[in-house]
Amino acid sequence: MNTRNPDKVVIVGGGTAGWMTASYLKKAFGERVSVTLVESGTIGTVGVGEATFSDIRHFFEFLDLREEEWMPACNATYKLAVRFQDWQRPGHHFYHPFEQMRSVDGFPLTDWWLQNGPTDRFDRDCFVMASLCDAGRSPRYLNGSLLQQEFDERAEEPAGLTMSEHQGKTQFPYAYHFEAALLAEFLSGYSKDRGVKHVVDEVLEVKLDDRGWISHVVTKEHGDIGGDLFVDCTGFRGVLLNQALGVPFVSYQDTLPNDSAVALQVPLDMEARGIPPYTRATAKEAGWIWTIPLIGRIGTGYVYAKDYCSPEEAERTLREFVGPEAADVEANHIRMRIGRSEQSWKNNCVAIGLSSGFVEPLESTGIFFIHHAIEQLVKHFPAGDWHPQLRAGYNSAVANVMDGVREFLVLHYLGAARNDTRYWKDTKTRAVPDALAERIERWKVQLPDSENVFPYYHGLPPYSYMAILLGTGAIGLRPSPALALADPAAAEKEFTAIRDRARFLVDTLPSQYEYFAAMGQRV
């Protein structure tokens, strides 16, 4: 048996997944591993305006990229939270922010809020970020300093950790919005400058050896391209993993019915409209609409289930929602494959991106899945014996992340008090994963903590579950009975401190538009 260490990686497919993978692997392994990326010049990518988790900054830090280098090239803006609009009732909104939950006397502040909150806005009472979002503030001052100074110096943060190792230690206060195609273009230049070979060609066939492993891909103009490890970044088609290697796809459609989207890229006068520091998810009759603010435009799209809405109806609803600015903008209709591959790594093929899995755009998990998979590939990169435990570890980590996010998204629909259409009525009777159903019963009397959420790393800390449970409004919750016997004075002091801190930051921070205009960007 050939025990030579694998040192030739072939990535099939470009887009965000392909170029994030290429740039990360090249930075991780340098000249010790050759990386070739093959992408068609004719097959389009799904990428639209993208929103992210705050952990994405670790990706850019790993590549030694500073914000001023990549953000202007990608029309990027800051994201402090997701704003959920009309999920509980028309006109109601709440935020799921990037901000750790405070605790008082051993109980999360949300418990104290349920016991005796100062207002009916849990997000503004328990998080500073909600007020900054309502006021449209940037997380940075005009001199570039961050609202939380310790992160500028990185003195309080452990270095060199993966996302799963960071969770619970710190919470960076923002993520990003950016144009996916522009990020792919930027990372393409970064990767090629560092030795990644770029082949623009169509893959005609995937050839297997007598073991069933991929030996090479056959291209139209460049002939055979061989390698040791092949990375499938071919999107929903899954050309290598699903088609050539026959790995089955595990659908999540029984619990998450949205299977379609229509997207628009709409130029807007951001000086007049401002640049909100959040992703907006607005509930509609048969799904929800995302709004992602970028430099000079918004990315927006209607995510829906075709059993409840036709593509024509969805496009009309989206255009009416955006207004006259969308009149001449071309629509991009997308069929989504919701679920994950049974294995994301089989033999010598690893799927990353949509070929691995996708759990609809709600909560901005697409880029997170890519980033997590790349980190795990480096962590489990094989030696010459291709030890099966490395594949098993990788597959377990990737599956756990997607299954955990699935539970979290199901909670959004099950928990939404909105009940005015057949779609929203059906969200209350649809299948629920057994473990989630058990957890919800516990959360009704004890809010989520690290011991009673999904037990494996999936990028979502307990406070995220608290925000959704409290914000969507359909699941009855009550505080810990112990609080009826506790002194509320310390909690009241904490609520006051949050309100005072929020007022100070709203008064002193610039708006997002003011910040990016001052940075010299053409907004």
Swiss-Prot record:
Q: What quaternary structure, including any partners, is listed in this protein's UniProt entry?
A: Homodimer.
Q: Catalysed reaction per UniProt?
A: L-tryptophan + FADH2 + chloride + O2 = 6-chloro-L-tryptophan + FAD + 2 H2O; D-tryptophan + FADH2 + chloride + O2 = 6-chloro-D-tryptophan + FAD + 2 H2O
Record-listed chloride binding positions: T365, G366
Q: Name one GO molecular function term.
A: monooxygenase activity
Q: Which gene encodes it?
A: sttH
Q: What is its EC number?
A: 1.14.19.59
Name of the protein in question: Tryptophan 6-halogenase SttH
The record ties this protein, via Pfam families, to: Trp_halogenase
Active site residues of this protein: K79
Q: What class of enzyme is it?
A: oxidoreductase
Q: At which positions is FAD bound?
A: G14, S40, I43, V46, V48, A51, V203, L354, I367
Please state how the activity of this protein depends on pH: Optimum pH is 6.
Q: Which InterPro entries match?
A: FAD/NAD-bd_sf (IPR036188), Flavin-dep_Halogenase_NPB (IPR050816), Flavin_halogenase (IPR006905), Trp_halogen (IPR033856)
What exactly does this protein do? Catalyzes the chlorination of tryptophan (Trp) at C6 position to yield 6-chloro-tryptophan. Accepts both L and D-Trp as the substrates. The enzyme also uses bromide to yield 6-bromo-Trp. In vitro, can also catalyze the halogenation of 3-indolepropionic acid, N-methyltryptophan and non-indolic aromatic substrates such as kynurenine, anthranilamide and N-phenylanthranilic acid.
Query: Which residue numbers mark the site Important for activity?
Result: E363
Q: Which family does it belong to?
A: Belongs to the flavin-dependent halogenase family. Bacterial tryptophan halogenase subfamily.
The record's keywords, sorted A to Z, are: FAD, Flavoprotein, Nucleotide-binding, Oxidoreductase
UniProt keyword annotation of Disulfide bond present: no
**Transmembrane region positions?**
none
The residues that the entry says bind L-tryptophan are: P97, Y456, Y457
The entry describes the temperature dependence as follows:
Optimum temperature is 40 degrees Celsius.
